[in-house]
């Protein structure tokens, strides 16, 4: 119990630090977004407006992540036997979905402007984009100091980094408009921004989806874990082996282990738990250890396709 208490205290300290970094980044993003919307309208720049729209999703992602971190920090109670730890996963799913929707809107408007390009104020675009690069660098630096293994933090980080790249593309587009008068550079830059959004969304949805579908954590092979359990000299049979992730950095395992008649089930269970924690980093285990019937062959069985990539 002491180890779990220390672990919970460390999580509380880390969570508070993460919330502070997120709050600072949120303040920067909201302040600059308000300025950028005004400049985008005056300059008639879709690239700037798409950046501002992306910053709106950044702000939403940061706010959602703050709420998710607060909820995830709540202790288990009542029917919520694991607490609300998966709030961070739902936050990542929402962030990924928002990126997909926004990318679609931007591409639609960009195509319309490619067909009939309006005039663009190149100077306003370049200056605002350079300021946006500076703001996003600071916000990225803040979030880089937070715990990016947390899916809520990682979702916000991906939003900010994508926005940083978008501002770089917008600055280049503005410079092209200034030098060549090629107004279509602005919507073309917007399509590039949308592509970055979709790439970031794919990563978020895939990682968070694996957790929601209770796939084995990345880097852990179920067959290897089952083999490690079966290697124990007193183990006769391993089945119903399941490995999943309750939340980011919270792997769990359950299995039914049969040992030879006369062996100490409790001692073997403790040895297996220690091995799983030291070798695979799994400290939340539920092992049912019983005696095997005579002459039962060694086998490892689990849910089909447990190692299939998601």
Regions found by a protein language model. Give the residues of each.
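Residue-level recognition of phosphate/Mg2+-coordinating polar/acidic sites
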Residues: 57
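Residue-level marker of regulatory loop/turn positions in helix-turn-helix DNA-binding domains and
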Residues: 16-20, 41
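Short, hydrophobic transmembrane alpha-helix segments
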Residues: 37-49
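First transmembrane helix
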Residues: 22-38, 135-138
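Alpha-helical transmembrane segments and adjacent TM-loop junctions that form the membrane-embedded core
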Residues: 2-17, 47, 53, 64-71, ...
């Amino acid at each position: 119990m002491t180890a779990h208490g220390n672990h919970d205290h460390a999580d509380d300290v880390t969570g508070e630090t993460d919330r502070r970094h997120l709050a600072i980044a949120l303040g920067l993003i909201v302040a600059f977004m308000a300025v950028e919307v005004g400049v985008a309208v005056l300059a008639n720049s879709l690239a700037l407006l798409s950046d501002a729209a992306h910053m709106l999703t950044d702000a939403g992602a940061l706010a959602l992540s703050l709420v998710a971190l607060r909820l995830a920090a709540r202790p288990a109670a009542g029917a919520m036997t694991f607490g609300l730890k998966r709030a961070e996963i739902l936050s990542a799913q929402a962030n990924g979905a928002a990126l997909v929707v926004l990318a679609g809107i931007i591409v639609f408007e960009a195509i319309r402007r490619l067909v009939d390009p309006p005039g663009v104020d190149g100077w306003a675009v370049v200056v605002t984009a350079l300021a946006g690069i500076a703001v996003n660098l600071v916000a990225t630096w803040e979030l880089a100091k937070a715990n990016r293994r947390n899916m809520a933090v990682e979702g916000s980080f991906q939003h900010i980094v994508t926005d940083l790249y978008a501002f770089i593309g917008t600055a280049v587009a503005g410079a092209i408009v200034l030098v060549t008068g090629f107004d279509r550079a602005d919507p073309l830059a917007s399509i590039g921004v949308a592509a970055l959004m979709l790439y970031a969304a794919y990563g978020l949805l895939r990682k968070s989806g694996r957790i929601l579908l209770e796939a084995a954590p990345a880097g852990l092979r179920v067959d290897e874990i089952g083999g490690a359990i079966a290697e124990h000299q007193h183990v006769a049979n391993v089945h119903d082996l399941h490995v999943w992730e309750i939340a980011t950095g919270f792997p769990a395992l359950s299995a039914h282990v049969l040992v030879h008649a006369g062996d100490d089930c409790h001692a073997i269970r403790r040895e297996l738990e220690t091995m799983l924690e030291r070798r695979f980093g799994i400290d939340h285990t539920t092992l049912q250890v019983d005696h095997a019937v005579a002459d039962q062959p060694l086998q490892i069985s689990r849910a089909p396709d447990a190692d299939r990539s998601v």
